[in-house]
UniProtKB/Swiss-Prot annotation:
InterPro entries registered for this protein in UniProt: MFS, MFS-Transporter, MFS_dom, MFS_trans_sf
Domain of life per record: Bacteria
Keyword field contains Nucleotide-binding: no
Keyword line: Cell membrane, Membrane, Transmembrane, Transmembrane helix, Transport
The protein, known as: Uncharacterized MFS-type transporter MT3072
GO molecular function annotation: transmembrane transporter activity
GO cellular component terms listed in the entry, alphabetical order: plasma membrane
Pfam families (alphabetical): MFS_1 (PF07690)
Annotated membrane topology: Multi-pass membrane protein
Family: Belongs to the major facilitator superfamily.
Places the protein is found: Cell membrane
Transmembrane region(s): 16-36, 52-72, 98-118, 168-188, 219-239, 243-263, 283-303, 366-386
Record region (Disordered): 417-445
Amino acid sequence: MSRDPTGVGARWAIMIVSLGVTASSFLFINGVAFLIPRLENARGTPLSHAGLLASMPSWGLVVTMFAWGYLLDHVGERMVMAVGSALTAAAAYAAASVHSLLWIGVFLFLGGMAAGGCNSAGGRLVSGWFPPQQRGLAMGIRQTAQPLGIASGALVIPELAERGVHAGLMFPAVVCTLAAVASVLGIVDPPRKSRTKASEQELASPYRGSSILWRIHAASALLMMPQTVTVTFMLVWLINHHGWSVAQAGVLVTISQLLGALGRVAVGRWSDHVGSRMRPVRLIAAAAAATLFLLAAVDNEGSRYDVLLMIAISVIAVLDNGLEAAAITEYAGPYWSGRALGIQNTTQRLMAAAGPPLFGSLITTAAYPTAWALCGVFPLAAVPLVPVRLLPPGLETRARRQSVRRHRWWQAVRCHAWPNGPRRPGPPGQPRRVRQGGTAITPPT
């Protein structure tokens, strides 16, 4: 690949390579959850213990995310993605080579430590190569890496695991090896001024004197819990709770993750259109909470809607990540975005690591509906934390235009400004606007 990829096609090609590399890291991080049925059936491993094993890559991520972010700000995306993928592959091969669950957990933890840089590097890469009016769409496409990685794991790992845990772990090992090669050949760092030429203001910490980033971190961490819980327990819920086969459950998990991938692209484009990353995040949080509460209400009641609600929450739960990553890179700037994304991913992974063992124990003692209800509290708590007034640099005019359109539409609705309908008088001195035609006012899009 050319080392000066200024063309549109070259930028998108780099983004696609970044997507594949990041998908491989999420395959490793989340793929262990698809070994749970094998661990339960072949080894008699309790669900709480299997959930703890599935969380080990996330615990490894927590340890190194900020360090990877610091390294990213200083050496660039290509180096971080290549080295991280290679080390993750080595850990996956090591985990596949041992029989003891203790040693498998150790190597999964080490692999999680190695995988921490890929997600931050991929987000920073997109922010560097794409202008503001395309960044939401590009970040949304790049963020399909997580559901695509999980979908590939759901489709392949359960079938391989029928031959043993070793066979299931070999799949992420091979994929991460290919990702390391792709990083070396296909990733090009975006052009940036050197740190020595940057102004003092550009190098200043974006956390100083502002709570914006901390609010984004807190909201995204809370929104991580529904994602973690559904990814970890959807497969085993379908098998044990509904009597599905491993193959049937794996296919449905794959379909839900593919729908989530398409949803991430759609909400990224939506954020470009409305000129805001955070307004969609608040709506996603509210929708996630409502869906989980509905699932808690109908589960165990013999309803035919519980599987549909599970698909819905598994899609909704993955929609927000790209929007938050785009907002962080835009607000933090090129010299702090690596560390800011490192902190962001650390807070998310703390939730991702804590979720499987805690909710595994809760499901064992109190059944699934209680777990869904408790999980719904997390996105509900995120709603007031989302900084909806934060506007992306370069899209302020578009955001204001959308706000004016919404304001005018709501004024019309509140004043019953419909054709042939009663109208409330406006403020003194305000000219009365005459509408013609018989079509009702439609809300702005």
